[in-house]
Amino acid sequence: MEQRITLKDYAMRFGQTKTAKDLGVYQSAINKAIHAGRKIFLTINADGSVYAEEVKPFPSNKKTTA
């Protein structure tokens, strides 16, 4: 059964070091993403594997009129 959880909640539960290891990134990247308030969700699969997806508006860059 898949479980979906925010990056912040996963890191609070398991620690930033384990979170980084599970996602294949550095701990500093986890810390920076959390402090920046990025909307990142982790899916935990039944086999224990974890992957992350970021949700952000499209288009992400709002163009200003000149």
UniProtKB/Swiss-Prot annotation:
DNA-binding region: 16-35
Assigned keywords, A-Z: DNA-binding, Early protein, Latency-replication decision, Repressor, Transcription, Transcription regulation, Viral latency, Viral latency initiation and maintenance
Transcription among keywords: yes
UniProt key word 4Fe-4S: no
GO biological process: latency-replication decision; negative regulation of transcription by competitive promoter binding; negative regulation of viral transcription; release from viral latency; response to UV
Effect of A33W: Loss of dimerization
GO molecular function: core promoter sequence-specific DNA binding; DNA binding; protein homodimerization activity
Subunit structure: Binds DNA as a homodimer.
The protein's role, per its UniProt record: Plays an essential role in the switch from lysogenic to lytic state and in fine-tuning the lytic phase activation. Mediates the de-repression of the lytic promoters from repression by cI at an early stage of prophage induction. Turns down the expression of the transcriptional activator cII, a factor that initiates the expression of repressor cI, the major component promoting latency. Additionally, cro is able to directly bind to the promoter region of cI thereby preventing the transcription of cI repressor.
Protein name (database record): Regulatory protein cro
Species the sequence originates in: Escherichia phage lambda
Gene for this chain: cro
